[in-house]
């Protein structure tokens, strides 16, 4: 729960980086909506303020992920005029694949993974991951990076909805309240 809540502090870093690097500040009246969305995700993810050294390390990694996601978002927005969407996405995904290839090669064991598992991983990489990130980058070209990033926080709400539809899981009252708070926060920013 910590990592999910911390990773979705990314809208804060996107908003700060957009103002700093892109000279696209967020009006002060909209900061409350950003904070409300982040708080809603924390409630939705059932954030519990517990602590241990191991949890602190994981929390630090999650914070690094949030900052990196923020910088990725701002970098994508900054390149909107320089490259067409699919050219930009192709370079980003190609370089990411090259970066991950050594780790994948070291840990690949053909005796463990059959062709069905490999096809499933490739399919997940191309369809939901590739299409989702390409649509996210398309949104970054059209709206303030914070707006696109706030909508991305709804991955968590989408996961809850999929849990209801596919697994019959009933969300807790705090999950429902958290999802509603995120939607109100997004509404305050966008409207």
Regions found by a protein language model. Give the residues of each.
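Structural signature of hydrophobic alpha-helical transmembrane segments
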Residues: 1-10, 55-68, 116-129, 180-182
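Helix-helix packing/entry segments at the starts of transmembrane helices
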Residues: 3-9, 75-97, 129-165
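Hydrophobic transmembrane alpha-helices of multi-pass small-molecule transport proteins
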Residues: 16-17, 26-47, 100, 122, ...
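Transmembrane alpha-helical segments that form core, pore/gating elements
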Residues: 14-16, 34, 50-108, 121, ...
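Hydrophobic core positions of alpha-helical segments in small-molecule transporters
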Residues: 6-9, 29-32, 57, 64, ...
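Hydrophobic residues within membrane-embedded alpha-helical segments of Major Facilitator Superfamily
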Residues: 13, 36, 42-43, 61, ...
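Membrane-interface helix termini and inter-helical loops of multi-pass transporters
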Residues: 45-57, 104-121, 164, 168-173
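Hydrophobic/aromatic residues within transmembrane alpha-helices
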Residues: 20-22, 26, 79, 88, ...
